[in-house]
Design a protein with these regions (language model features):
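Short acidic alpha-helical/loop segments enriched in Asp/Glu that coordinate divalent cations
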Residues: 84-95, 114
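Non-heme Fe(II)/2-oxoglutarate
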Residues: 1-88, 109
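Catalytic core of non-heme Fe(II) oxygenases with the double-stranded beta-helix
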Residues: 95-124
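Sequence-level motif detector for i,i+2 pairs with an aromatic at +2
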Residues: 1, 7-9, 91, 96-98, ...
């Protein structure tokens, strides 16, 4: 585990620790979601845009049973991060607003954006 202080921003980096079988199952589920949304023939943001589940109706992965173990791990890391930067996690009410997968293939990209409504964001 490592904390990187970058100006006023602290970045927490760690391995989540999913076993390979579960990781492969989750990846397949993400591809299934992508394929399911292919019924919408129009790419939301252009031909070179990556697939982002949030704009295709898959913005609540944390509510899906298949992703429960992943989010249990993420929760532990969030609490660890908050403790490490000096906050009492018992005084904070943690909750997920949204969570989604992305699929980026060669020459595809995700447009610049921010998560201004969130105090913490993570990527896995």
């Amino acid at each position: 585990m490592e904390i990187i202080n970058l100006f006023p921003l602290s970045i927490y980096r760690s391995k989540v620790g999913l076993d390979d079988a579960l990781r492969k199952t989750l990846i397949q589920e993400i591809y299934n979601q992508e394929n399911e949304s292919k019924n919408n023939k129009t790419k939301m943001y252009g031909e070179r845009s990556s697939w982002t589940g949030d704009v295709y109706g898959h913005e609540y992965l944390y509510k899906e049973k298949k992703f429960e173990v992943l989010f249990d791990h993420i929760e532990k890391h969030i609490i660890n991060y908050v403790k490490k930067i000096g906050y009492n996690e018992e005084k904070i009410d943690f909750y997920y607003q949204r969570s989604w997968a992305t699929v980026s293939r060669k020459n595809e990209y995700i447009k610049y954006h921010n998560h201004s409504q969130s105090h913490l964001s993570f990527a896995y």
